[in-house]
Amino acid sequence: VNVLQVMQWRGVQDLVFSSSCTVYGQPTHMPVSERAPDHSASSPYGYTKVVGERMIRDAVRANHTLKAVLLRYFNPIGAHPEGHIGELPIGVPGNLVPFITQTAAGLRKQLTIHGNDYATTDGTCVRDYLHVLDVASAHVMALRWMKEQPSPLCEAFNLGAGEGHSVKQVVDLFEEVTGQHVPKVQGPRRAGDVAAIWADNTKSREVLGWNCEHDLRSALRDAWNWQCSLKEASAHH
Protein backbone atom coordinates (compact mmCIF):
# COMPACT_ATOMS: atom_id res chain seq x y z
CA VAL A 1 0.00 0.00 0.00
CA ASN A 2 2.80 2.41 0.91
CA VAL A 3 4.61 1.79 -2.39
CA LEU A 4 1.44 2.35 -4.42
CA GLN A 5 0.72 5.56 -2.53
CA VAL A 6 4.23 6.93 -3.08
CA MET A 7 4.02 5.98 -6.77
CA GLN A 8 0.84 8.02 -7.05
CA TRP A 9 2.34 11.01 -5.25
CA ARG A 10 5.47 10.97 -7.41
CA GLY A 11 3.77 10.22 -10.71
CA VAL A 12 5.43 6.82 -11.17
CA GLN A 13 3.28 4.71 -13.48
CA ASP A 14 5.24 1.47 -14.01
CA LEU A 15 5.54 -1.33 -11.43
CA VAL A 16 7.20 -4.75 -11.51
CA PHE A 17 6.02 -6.79 -8.52
CA SER A 18 8.00 -9.72 -7.14
CA SER A 19 5.26 -12.29 -6.68
CA SER A 20 5.53 -16.04 -6.19
CA CYS A 21 4.24 -19.39 -7.37
CA THR A 22 2.94 -19.83 -3.83
CA VAL A 23 -0.17 -17.91 -4.93
CA TYR A 24 -1.30 -21.14 -6.64
CA GLY A 25 -1.17 -23.33 -3.51
CA GLN A 26 -1.27 -26.98 -4.61
CA PRO A 27 -2.30 -26.90 -8.29
CA THR A 28 -4.56 -29.61 -9.66
CA HIS A 29 -2.76 -29.63 -13.02
CA MET A 30 0.93 -29.46 -13.90
CA PRO A 31 2.69 -27.56 -15.27
CA VAL A 32 0.77 -24.68 -13.76
CA SER A 33 -0.05 -21.73 -15.99
CA GLU A 34 -1.10 -18.18 -15.21
CA ARG A 35 -4.69 -19.23 -15.93
CA ALA A 36 -4.76 -21.43 -12.80
CA PRO A 37 -6.63 -20.09 -9.74
CA ASP A 38 -4.33 -17.68 -7.92
CA HIS A 39 -6.09 -17.50 -4.57
CA SER A 40 -5.28 -20.94 -3.12
CA ALA A 41 -2.11 -20.13 -1.18
CA SER A 42 -1.38 -22.70 1.52
CA SER A 43 1.18 -20.67 3.50
CA PRO A 44 1.22 -17.23 5.17
CA TYR A 45 3.95 -16.13 2.75
CA GLY A 46 1.86 -17.18 -0.23
CA TYR A 47 -1.16 -15.37 1.13
CA THR A 48 0.81 -12.11 1.41
CA LYS A 49 1.58 -12.42 -2.31
CA VAL A 50 -2.08 -13.05 -3.13
CA VAL A 51 -3.04 -9.91 -1.19
CA GLY A 52 -0.25 -7.91 -2.84
CA GLU A 53 -1.40 -8.91 -6.32
CA ARG A 54 -5.01 -8.02 -5.50
CA MET A 55 -3.99 -4.59 -4.21
CA ILE A 56 -2.10 -3.92 -7.43
CA ARG A 57 -5.01 -5.06 -9.61
CA ASP A 58 -7.34 -2.80 -7.63
CA ALA A 59 -4.92 0.11 -8.04
CA VAL A 60 -4.77 -0.42 -11.82
CA ARG A 61 -8.57 -0.47 -12.01
CA ALA A 62 -8.71 2.78 -10.05
CA ASN A 63 -5.86 4.49 -11.95
CA HIS A 64 -6.00 4.00 -15.71
CA THR A 65 -2.49 5.39 -16.20
CA LEU A 66 -0.89 2.65 -14.10
CA LYS A 67 0.92 -0.35 -15.60
CA ALA A 68 2.01 -3.40 -13.60
CA VAL A 69 3.72 -6.72 -14.27
CA LEU A 70 3.42 -9.49 -11.67
CA LEU A 71 6.39 -11.85 -11.89
CA ARG A 72 5.56 -15.12 -10.18
CA TYR A 73 8.92 -16.59 -9.20
CA PHE A 74 9.13 -20.31 -8.71
CA ASN A 75 12.36 -21.22 -6.84
CA PRO A 76 15.26 -18.86 -7.59
CA ILE A 77 18.65 -20.28 -6.61
CA GLY A 78 22.31 -19.73 -7.42
CA ALA A 79 24.50 -16.65 -7.28
CA HIS A 80 26.62 -14.47 -9.51
CA PRO A 81 29.15 -16.77 -11.25
CA GLU A 82 32.10 -14.71 -9.97
CA GLY A 83 31.04 -15.34 -6.38
CA HIS A 84 30.75 -11.67 -5.41
CA ILE A 85 26.96 -11.49 -4.96
CA GLY A 86 24.68 -14.16 -3.56
CA GLU A 87 22.11 -15.18 -0.99
CA LEU A 88 22.89 -14.53 2.68
CA PRO A 89 20.00 -15.72 4.86
CA ILE A 90 19.64 -14.33 8.36
CA GLY A 91 19.55 -17.20 10.84
CA VAL A 92 18.41 -20.63 9.71
CA PRO A 93 17.77 -20.72 5.94
CA GLY A 94 14.17 -21.28 4.95
CA ASN A 95 15.09 -22.42 1.45
CA LEU A 96 16.70 -25.66 0.35
CA VAL A 97 19.85 -24.61 -1.50
CA PRO A 98 21.35 -22.26 1.14
CA PHE A 99 20.77 -25.01 3.70
CA ILE A 100 22.58 -27.47 1.42
CA THR A 101 25.57 -25.18 0.90
CA GLN A 102 25.85 -24.27 4.59
CA THR A 103 25.72 -27.94 5.55
CA ALA A 104 28.35 -28.86 2.96
CA ALA A 105 30.54 -26.04 4.30
CA GLY A 106 30.27 -27.43 7.83
CA LEU A 107 28.22 -24.53 9.19
CA ARG A 108 25.32 -26.87 9.95
CA LYS A 109 25.43 -30.42 11.25
CA GLN A 110 23.00 -31.90 8.77
CA LEU A 111 20.24 -31.21 6.28
CA THR A 112 16.75 -32.24 7.28
CA ILE A 113 14.63 -33.48 4.38
CA HIS A 114 11.07 -32.64 5.32
CA GLY A 115 8.72 -35.42 4.31
CA ASN A 116 9.30 -38.61 2.31
CA ASP A 117 5.71 -39.69 1.71
CA TYR A 118 4.55 -37.16 -0.89
CA ALA A 119 2.99 -38.42 -4.11
CA THR A 120 6.19 -37.82 -6.09
CA THR A 121 8.78 -40.08 -7.70
CA ASP A 122 10.88 -40.43 -4.53
CA GLY A 123 8.46 -39.16 -1.89
CA THR A 124 10.11 -35.74 -1.45
CA CYS A 125 8.76 -32.36 -2.54
CA VAL A 126 9.21 -31.33 -6.17
CA ARG A 127 9.97 -27.74 -7.13
CA ASP A 128 10.91 -25.72 -10.20
CA TYR A 129 14.39 -24.22 -9.69
CA LEU A 130 15.79 -21.40 -11.82
CA HIS A 131 19.00 -19.40 -11.72
CA VAL A 132 18.78 -15.97 -10.11
CA LEU A 133 20.49 -14.50 -13.20
CA ASP A 134 17.51 -15.63 -15.26
CA VAL A 135 15.21 -13.92 -12.77
CA ALA A 136 17.23 -10.71 -13.18
CA SER A 137 17.02 -10.83 -16.97
CA ALA A 138 13.25 -11.35 -16.74
CA HIS A 139 12.90 -8.06 -14.88
CA VAL A 140 14.69 -6.19 -17.65
CA MET A 141 12.56 -7.84 -20.33
CA ALA A 142 9.37 -7.17 -18.36
CA LEU A 143 10.22 -3.47 -18.04
CA ARG A 144 10.98 -3.14 -21.74
CA TRP A 145 7.78 -4.93 -22.71
CA MET A 146 5.68 -2.91 -20.28
CA LYS A 147 7.02 0.39 -21.66
CA GLU A 148 5.66 -0.56 -25.09
CA GLN A 149 2.15 -1.39 -23.83
CA PRO A 150 -0.78 1.00 -23.41
CA SER A 151 -2.20 1.65 -19.96
CA PRO A 152 -3.97 0.45 -17.92
CA LEU A 153 -2.10 -2.84 -17.71
CA CYS A 154 -1.76 -5.66 -15.18
CA GLU A 155 -0.26 -8.93 -16.40
CA ALA A 156 1.10 -11.94 -14.51
CA PHE A 157 3.99 -14.09 -15.77
CA ASN A 158 5.43 -17.33 -14.44
CA LEU A 159 9.20 -17.39 -13.97
CA GLY A 160 10.27 -21.02 -13.88
CA ALA A 161 12.44 -23.44 -15.81
CA GLY A 162 9.39 -25.51 -16.71
CA GLU A 163 10.53 -28.74 -15.05
CA GLY A 164 10.42 -30.10 -11.52
CA HIS A 165 13.18 -31.65 -9.39
CA SER A 166 12.71 -33.37 -6.05
CA VAL A 167 14.60 -32.46 -2.90
CA LYS A 168 16.59 -35.69 -3.11
CA GLN A 169 17.42 -35.06 -6.76
CA VAL A 170 18.73 -31.57 -5.95
CA VAL A 171 20.88 -32.85 -3.08
CA ASP A 172 22.28 -35.68 -5.22
CA LEU A 173 23.05 -33.32 -8.10
CA PHE A 174 24.75 -30.85 -5.75
CA GLU A 175 27.01 -33.61 -4.46
CA GLU A 176 27.78 -34.69 -8.02
CA VAL A 177 28.53 -31.17 -9.27
CA THR A 178 30.64 -30.02 -6.31
CA GLY A 179 32.12 -33.25 -4.99
CA GLN A 180 30.91 -32.29 -1.51
CA HIS A 181 29.09 -34.60 0.87
CA VAL A 182 25.88 -33.33 2.47
CA PRO A 183 24.95 -35.12 5.74
CA LYS A 184 21.19 -35.52 5.81
CA VAL A 185 18.40 -36.94 7.95
CA GLN A 186 14.74 -37.55 7.33
CA GLY A 187 12.24 -35.33 9.09
CA PRO A 188 8.48 -34.76 9.16
CA ARG A 189 6.56 -32.70 6.65
CA ARG A 190 6.52 -28.93 7.05
CA ALA A 191 3.17 -27.21 7.38
CA GLY A 192 2.26 -25.33 4.21
CA ASP A 193 4.53 -27.30 1.85
CA VAL A 194 2.84 -28.43 -1.35
CA ALA A 195 3.83 -31.79 -2.83
CA ALA A 196 4.87 -30.61 -6.27
CA ILE A 197 4.74 -27.55 -8.49
CA TRP A 198 6.49 -26.48 -11.66
CA ALA A 199 5.82 -23.79 -14.21
CA ASP A 200 4.26 -23.51 -17.59
CA ASN A 201 6.48 -20.66 -18.79
CA THR A 202 4.97 -20.41 -22.28
CA LYS A 203 3.56 -16.92 -21.70
CA SER A 204 6.90 -15.53 -20.47
CA ARG A 205 8.68 -17.02 -23.47
CA GLU A 206 6.19 -15.92 -26.09
CA VAL A 207 5.27 -12.49 -24.74
CA LEU A 208 8.46 -11.30 -23.02
CA GLY A 209 10.91 -13.30 -25.14
CA TRP A 210 12.41 -14.72 -21.94
CA ASN A 211 14.13 -18.09 -21.56
CA CYS A 212 16.08 -19.84 -18.84
CA GLU A 213 19.69 -19.63 -20.02
CA HIS A 214 21.19 -21.45 -17.01
CA ASP A 215 20.53 -25.03 -15.96
CA LEU A 216 20.24 -26.53 -12.49
CA ARG A 217 23.85 -27.74 -12.51
CA SER A 218 25.25 -24.26 -13.09
CA ALA A 219 22.92 -22.76 -10.47
CA LEU A 220 24.10 -25.25 -7.84
CA ARG A 221 27.72 -24.72 -8.83
CA ASP A 222 27.37 -20.95 -8.51
CA ALA A 223 25.60 -21.30 -5.15
CA TRP A 224 28.52 -23.38 -3.86
CA ASN A 225 31.09 -20.90 -5.22
CA TRP A 226 29.27 -18.15 -3.33
CA GLN A 227 29.34 -20.17 -0.12
CA CYS A 228 33.08 -20.71 -0.59
CA SER A 229 33.57 -16.97 -1.14
CA LEU A 230 31.79 -16.26 2.14
CA LYS A 231 34.03 -18.75 3.92
CA GLU A 232 37.16 -17.13 2.47
CA ALA A 233 35.94 -13.65 3.41
CA SER A 234 35.23 -14.66 7.01
CA ALA A 235 38.68 -16.26 7.29
CA HIS A 236 40.30 -12.89 6.57
CA HIS A 237 38.47 -11.11 9.40
Stretch-by-stretch model annotation:
Residues 96-237:
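C-terminal substrate-binding subdomain of Rossmann-fold SDR/epimerase-dehydratase oxidoreductases
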Residues 28-30, 80-85, 125-126, 170:
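Short aromatic-enriched loop/helix-cap "lid" or pocket-rim segments at secondary-structure transitions
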Residues 71, 82, 110-113:
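Oxidoreductase cofactor-interface core, primarily capturing Rossmann-like NAD(P)-dependent enzymes
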Residues 1-5, 54, 133-136, 140:
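Conserved active-site region of classical short-chain dehydrogenase/reductase
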Residues 1-2, 9, 13-14, 23-75, ...:
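Catalytic helix-loop patch of NAD(P)-dependent Rossmann-fold dehydrogenases
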Residues 11-15, 65-67, 109-110, 151-155:
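Active-site loop of short-chain dehydrogenase/reductase
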